[in-house]
């Protein structure tokens, strides 16, 4: 399986379309991010292992070179990568540190006399784990603590040779095959251990931090934490690529399940032909909301891709686009979780046929389950969103205290009016305006609630921020998902309005309403608790979802 995947990667990257996409990546031409994301989605639909392995080599390893290196690094390393003269891997995660990448323990100690970095794995917890392409790759983009004169400058990325052109490991490098996994059997994941491996000083990807020949460290960002944030922000496109791959799996699973549901017949009126199983209400209720969600995620992900394109094309540093980073983090979590739920329903809705590997749904389930934790654990991704929303809320008070207070008062009064008995007949539950107002209301209330909780714990109870934040994580997750839901529904509605074909627009509007109804229906207890819905309105929403 692995050898076949290697052949497929080589074949795919030789295709003119993908060669052109690689050139666009190198040159950062307009809309290159969006094009690459869609290509990755389609490639993953054809074979998930091939799509993921291409992503490891070109998005992660290649992305590290493009986004963390200098123009000289791009010329030296990325162009030969495009020409398939070698392959690479991305080595950040360690046995002891995954989500908290700042705590990685691999060391890169600068040797002044030799003008080299010494890459070393000082302990078992510092072993690089789950590294894709570990058993085939020639070079690794290794994140390690940069140490000069015994002092760490924080994590930096280094290009480390792993194998020669014949596939033999270089001295000091150990690669251990992690063997069998739940899925992605075509991807070779392994453990990397470095025993004082020496690399040239120039192999440091130095966009955000460099070491001069005299051993002096220079960086445009003085704060270590801010510097590492900038490095992680530069890798944002690869996180969005996972969302696109998850959507590809959703779309493929739904296509198979819905087509099967239109061909399979079970039960029916006496003396008449059995009906298609899609005509059974439970089958429709399980599949159609997932289809609506897949459409919604398609439009909002394209929106995020367009924003990324614009920033990259204009040469902006992604670290300064915090709201975009938060959006991508939220979409990564939301899309991968929805994919898992969707494929499980697709499997069940196709019965025994869905369990057969030849029909692909069970394979997609196994292959994409890991999406919930790689490229950022989904729960941690929600914290990225929550921190940005908290920062946005506090910023408006710091910059314009009076305006912030007035805005908060106006929103609070407006929310109270919306939850009064006078408000319930203003909008009908089957109207898109009602659904948009509902998801905005939920996000706004949860945001105010989180701010109040954090303020009380830090200012009144004198707790440190970490413990205050940690005790509010459930609220953070709820707010972050509410924010992602709101943006997704808004982008879906905008896409529907801009659809040029009337017939397509009418059909898309039905799915947009279904998606919005799903969002409100699944949180109906919260809306009832906050008196945004009456029991009668909740019943109408339930009936609407069943139509």
Swiss-Prot record:
Domain of life, per the record?
Eukaryota
Could you tell me the EC number(s) of this protein?
1.3.3.-
Binding residues for FAD: 350-355
State which residue ranges cross the membrane. Answer: none
What is a single Pfam family found in this protein's UniProt entry? Acyl-CoA_dh_M
Q: Which PANTHER family match?
A: ACYL-COENZYME A OXIDASE-LIKE PROTEIN, ELECTRON TRANSPORT OXIDOREDUCTASE
Q: What class of enzyme is it?
A: oxidoreductase
Under Gene Ontology molecular function, one entry of this record is: flavin adenine dinucleotide binding
The record's similarity note reads: Belongs to the acyl-CoA oxidase family.
Identify the GO cellular component terms for this protein.
peroxisomal matrix; peroxisome
Q: Which SUPFAM superfamilies match?
A: Acyl-CoA dehydrogenase C-terminal domain-like, Acyl-CoA dehydrogenase NM domain-like
Q: Which UniProt keywords apply?
A: FAD, Flavoprotein, Oxidoreductase
What are the recorded Gene Ontology BP terms?
fatty acid beta-oxidation using acyl-CoA oxidase
Q: What is this protein called?
A: Acyl-coenzyme A oxidase-like protein
Required co-factors:
FAD
